[in-house]
Amino acid sequence: MPKKIHQPGGSLYCGVTLLGVLCLVVFRLIPGIPFGTYVMAERDHYHTIDDPNVPCNFYDTVNLTGHRLFPNGSYDYYGTIVPAELVGTYDYIHSSLTERIEVREHVRGCVCKFKSCLNICCPWRQVFNSEVDGCIIDHSDNRTWPDPPMLNITFRNESTILVNMFTQFAIQSFRPCPKMFSLQPETNNWDDYLLFENGSMLRVDDKLLIRKNEFCMVPTYVNESDMFYTIHPANCDMQDDHSTVKIINSYAMMFSIPFMMLTIAVYLLIPELRNQHGKSLVCYLIGLSVGYSSLCYVQLYQVDATGVTCKVFGYTAYFFFMGAYMWLSVISFDLWHNFRGTRGINRFQEKKRFLFYSLYSWGIALVFLAFTYCAQQLTNLPANLKPGIGDGVYCWLDMSNWAAMIYFYGPILAIVVANTIMFIMTAIKIHGVQREMARIIASENSTKNLRTEKDKRFYRAWSNYRFGLFLRLFLIMGITWLTELISYFVGSDKGWSKLFYISDLANAMQGFLIFMLFVMKKKVKHLITNRCSSVRDGSNQRQSQYSTKTTSSSVANLSLHEKPSVEKPLVISSSVDPQKTTIFR
């Protein structure tokens, strides 16, 4: 008897996958390693509101201490009236995009919620001094400051107008990063930039759109002999320690997408896998792959946030992500439904049920898309209640306020909770069925129920397979999304929030994990081998049929070209089988 060849099991692939994820996380945490040119600080988590008791996040506020207070609770901030409902008490400040410092309580106003803000690195007429690591008034500096400072601003109609910085914008004073460099287009052509009316900036050389709180305006000069300052933007240093989160996650998603495509192909081409679970998994992966592709495009190619392309990719990503989450709930429900002990259904009923699932998943995703689009484009809701897709700053959802909870994380939270409940109920049911079967097999009447040892082994294998399917689905599609939600609520300004880099990366690599756990299994690889063998055998059979057809046709053509004879009537070979020819075609 030949020796049985043992192939690598699922545990080995899981170990390799986990090792790869951990290596990527460690690589991401190494400081000073940029991915691409001019990578920016991580862009989503620092937009979350730190304290639910304040009206907006810190980066949309200005310090109102010392400014005029009106009886109705509003403030006058250099001619801009900040209403009372947008005024709050803060006991912290941010010294950079990722560092929070506790300070004495002071009043701040959300002026950026109703007027475009522009950030200056230091209070006006102060300069940054690296020795004291702060802003100072340099009395030895005799250079002249522009009064008033004039800037070329590009508006939505693509016109560029020279405007007074202080009248066009509400001025913030904040240094986004410890290490920064200024753009100087007078000396470097690659330092050209465009400032937009919403306070964002486009760096022309690499087409990078930078948000208002990711850069600041700074006084610059070209030569030491210059006696006047010119105002230009300063960017975060491309080797900032926190600069690679979004970039590495985007590349992880790009790495994951081909594995999703391979998994989809396997489950569509193998007949044994085209059951209800397989088709639901394919639909989930289609939604996830299109969503990942759209998100990678807007993050890596820096699409103009004011253009139509930005909106198209943003809403496309939103629709397919929501569709994927709906299919996630379908998978959980169908798994729970199958373990309830319901009677089997025929093929027609299965197709009907899949059609219902499809209408449910894509239909609800379409409803969410319509609701989100109307909220952004067709309503006069406050800016902090709009999703932010294609608003001139974001191509994806605006994570700077709790509106993201309404349009994205809220529905996901509901789905994850429902899925977790169904997973727990399914686990309880599986455990109960396994105990019952163990009792039956051990009983004296087991021969009446499972008459052969082969039947017993088959049911044990089936039960273990179902439990393994349940466990894989729960780990990949339940735990990872749950940690993503926790990561959103926690934010990234806490020291231990770096732990969520692992879950973020696991989510980005979900396609790779699914491929390893659902395709690189012994049974599935065996089905793939059988499928390839059957296709190869079918090809050989068709080639044989084609050879027979060619020979018969040659005889027929020879007979047709011969001159008919009375003594020898025309005979055309009947060996060409019309049915076989049709099959070949």
Swiss-Prot record:
Primary gene name: mthl10
Pfam families: 7tm_2, Methuselah_N
Biological process per Gene Ontology, one example term: response to starvation
Cytoplasmic-side segments: 272-280, 334-353, 426-466, 520-585
Glycosylation-annotated residues: N63, N72, N142, N152, N157, N198, N223
Taxonomic lineage of the native organism: Eukaryota, Metazoa, Ecdysozoa, Arthropoda, Hexapoda
Record topology, Extracellular segments: 33-250, 302-312, 375-404, 488-498
Xref: Gene3D superfamilies: 2.30.160.11, Rhodopsin 7-helix transmembrane proteins
Topology with respect to the bilayer: Multi-pass membrane protein
Result, substituting M150V: In strain: ZIM(S)24
Name recorded for this polypeptide: Probable G-protein coupled receptor Mth-like 10
Similarity comment: family membership: Belongs to the G-protein coupled receptor 2 family. Mth subfamily.
Signal peptide extent: 1-32
Disulphide bond pairs: C56-C110, C112-C117, C121-C216, C122-C135, C177-C236
Top-level taxon in the UniProt lineage: Eukaryota
Segments passing through the bilayer: 251-271, 281-301, 313-333, 354-374, 405-425, 467-487, 499-519
Record-linked InterPro entries: GPCR_2-like_7TM, GPCR_2_secretin-like, Methusela_ecto_dom_1, Methuselah_N_dom, Methuselah_N_sf, Mth_GPCR
Compartments, record wording: Cell membrane
A GO cellular-component term linked to this record: membrane
Keyword list, A-Z: Cell membrane, Disulfide bond, G-protein coupled receptor, Glycoprotein, Membrane, Receptor, Signal, Transducer, Transmembrane, Transmembrane helix
One Gene Ontology term of the molecular function aspect: G protein-coupled peptide receptor activity
